[in-house]
């Protein structure tokens, strides 16, 4: 199912309801994102004459860490399978300096988009690809004698990794004994009897680690060189010994890739990134510049000016082709403790017309976060201990006390929002998680007294609270 179909089925109200399954509160932020998403679908239905005039209304989320800014954007992208990329504004540097180039956020988005499209296309060719992969696997498990004897290799072929070793041609005679053997292997393969057997397969070698390392150091300009070098020579292959189970996956991906048109994949990936893509720029408050800040402030303003043309709409070159950023939805977020949105350059402020202030989490919110979402923390710890054969039970009073402690610690020290619950629960259940394999009990109940016993000594010592919780 494509993302356009998914968006067609989901109204803004339904999108908010889906977000409620994972995120507590922040109704205003959820509504704004849901409307922005629905507007993209509405735009697709318009006449081409007016469609090009309608650009997404970018969103600026303002609120302390841990209240759900990133999670809202991440979940919304998952719900509609839209290309989504998260970047941190502090990782970028002004053009001409060592560091990440702001254009890399668009390249990252296109990579995600192409991967999403490829996954969908692989599902369309799955039946044929699996059949082809199975045939190759059977030939690897029962090779012909003629193929076994062919060991000579051209020296240049050895240098550049060679081409795929051809399977025997359809015209090649296969004796009856080999046919019978392959028939037996096919039956055993389909019944999973050979899944743990070892087989040797040829896989593409990873790209040059030196180029990878240089890219990791922030040299995004190495992308073009890397792609140019990789296109000059055939993909180098190496032999790996893997289980039949792994070989099935490797050969399936290889066969599926052969059935997918690379040009069509790139074109559709770019189109989806342009029309449906979302880029989440976190920590944008850290590049807000204030008067009298010296060289550091000048550099921050330079990053803002580099981001501006991308948000406004510009043509960015990627290895798949040129991307127009005009219709990409940008969601920026920041705590704005030390600065305010008006400290951003006016041109950039104007490109984020929708501003949402997210609420600080209350004690009641903490209680709901612990119990209501589909991926609630308490459910996660229950599932972890269930693997040891232990049923972990939390009383209502215990959960209320955990929520109270989390809220109190956030009030007394740095407010890190819902992330505080991770720290508190890990400290609370530390001994239990350590001793679980040796505990001979079917169930363990966490009560309010247990919570007080484990956390009260730390709560009473303010210095310890700051370091441990």
UniProtKB/Swiss-Prot annotation:
Where's it found, cell-wise?
A: Cytoplasm
Q: Which residues bind ATP?
A: 24, 66-71, 282, 347, 419
Q: Where is this protein primarily located?
A: cytoplasm
Keywords, ordered alphabetically: ATP-binding, Chaperone, Cytoplasm, Nucleotide-binding
Q: Which residues form the signal peptide?
A: none
Cite a single GO BP annotation.
Answer: protein unfolding
Can you provide one Gene Ontology molecular function annotated for this UniProt record? proteasome-activating activity
Q: SUPFAM superfamilies in the record, alphabetically?
A: P-loop containing nucleoside triphosphate hydrolases (SSF52540)
Q: What positions belong to coiled-coil segments?
A: none
Would I find Chloroplast among this entry's keywords? no
Q: Which GO terms describe its cellular component?
A: HslUV protease complex
Where do transmembrane segments lie in this chain? none
Q: Please tell me whether the keyword ATP-binding is annotated for this protein.
A: yes
Cross-referenced InterPro entries: AAA+_ATPase, ATP-dep_Clp_protease_ClpX, ATPase_AAA_core, Clp_ATPase_C, HslU, P-loop_NTPase
Quote the SMART domains the UniProt record gives: AAA, ClpB_D2-small
Taken from the record, one Pfam family name reads ClpB_D2-small
NCBIfam families per the record?
hslU, PRK05201.1
The entry's function note states: ATPase subunit of a proteasome-like degradation complex; this subunit has chaperone activity. The binding of ATP and its subsequent hydrolysis by HslU are essential for unfolding of protein substrates subsequently hydrolyzed by HslV. HslU recognizes the N-terminal part of its protein substrates and unfolds these before they are guided to HslV for hydrolysis.
Q: What PANTHER family has UniProt attached to this entry?
A: ATP-DEPENDENT CLP PROTEASE ATP-BINDING SUBUNIT CLPX-LIKE, MITOCHONDRIAL-RELATED (PTHR48102), ATP-DEPENDENT PROTEASE ATPASE SUBUNIT HSLU (PTHR48102:SF3)
Subunit notes for this chain?
A double ring-shaped homohexamer of HslV is capped on each side by a ring-shaped HslU homohexamer. The assembly of the HslU/HslV complex is dependent on binding of ATP.
Q: Which family does it belong to?
A: Belongs to the ClpX chaperone family. HslU subfamily.
This protein is called ATP-dependent protease ATPase subunit HslU
Per the record, the gene is hslU
């Amino acid at each position: 199912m494509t993302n356009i179909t998914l968006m067609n089925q989901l109204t803004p109200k339904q999108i908010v309801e889906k977000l409620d399954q994972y995120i507590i509160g922040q109704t205003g932020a959820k509504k704004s994102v849901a409307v922005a998403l629905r507007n993209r679908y509405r735009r697709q239905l318009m006449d081409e004459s007016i469609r090009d005039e309608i650009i997404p209304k970018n969103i600026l989320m303002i609120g302390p860490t841990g209240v759900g800014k990133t999670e809202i954007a991440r979940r919304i992208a998952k719900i509609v399978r839209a290309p989504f990329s998260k970047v941190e504004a502090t990782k970028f540097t002004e053009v001409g300096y060592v560091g990440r180039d702001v254009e890399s956020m668009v390249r990252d988005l296109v990579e995600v988009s192409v991967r999403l499209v490829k996954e969908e296309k692989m599902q369309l060719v799955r039946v044929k690809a699996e059949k082809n992969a199975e045939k190759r696997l059977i030939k690897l498990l029962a090779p012909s004698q003629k193929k076994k004897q062919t060991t000579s290799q051209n020296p240049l072929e050895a240098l550049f990794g060679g081409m795929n070793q051809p399977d025997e041609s359809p015209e090649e005679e296969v004796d009856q004994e080999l046919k019978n053997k392959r028939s037996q292997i096919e039956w055993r393969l389909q019944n999973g009897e050979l899944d743990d057997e070892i087989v040797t397969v040829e896989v593409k070698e990873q790209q040059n680690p030196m180029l990878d390392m240089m890219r990791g150091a922030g040299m995004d300009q190495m992308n073009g060189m890397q792609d140019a070098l990789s296109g000059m020579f055939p993909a180098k292959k190496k032999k790996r010994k893997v289980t039949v189970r792994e070989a099935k996956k490797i050969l399936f991906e290889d066969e599926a890739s052969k059935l997918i048109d690379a040009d069509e994949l790139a074109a559709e990936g770019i189109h989806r990134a342009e029309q449906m893509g979302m880029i989440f720029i976190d920590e944008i408050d850290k590049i807000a510049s204030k008067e009298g800040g010296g060289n550091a402030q000048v550099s921050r303003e330079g990053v803002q000016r580099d981001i501006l043309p991308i948000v406004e709409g510009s043509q960015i070159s990627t290895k798949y082709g040129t991307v127009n950023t005009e219709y990409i939805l940008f969601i920026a977020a920041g705590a704005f403790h030390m600065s305010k949105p008006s400290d951003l350059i006016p041109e950039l402020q104007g490109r984020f017309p929708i501003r949402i202030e997210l609420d600080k989490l209350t004690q009641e919110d903490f209680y709901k976060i612990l119990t209501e979402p589909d991926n609630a923390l308490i459910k996660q710890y229950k599932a972890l201990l269930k693997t040891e054969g232990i049923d972990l039970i939390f009383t209502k009073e215990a959960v209320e006390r955990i929520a109270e402690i989390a809220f109190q610690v956030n009030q007394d020290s740095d407010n890190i929002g819902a992330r505080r619950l991770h720290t508190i629960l890990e400290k609370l259940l530390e001994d239990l998680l350590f001793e679980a394999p040796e505990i001979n009990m079917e169930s363990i109940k966490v009560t309010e007294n247990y919570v007080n016993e484990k956390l009260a000594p730390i709560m009473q010592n303010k210095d310890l609270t700051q370091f441990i919780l």
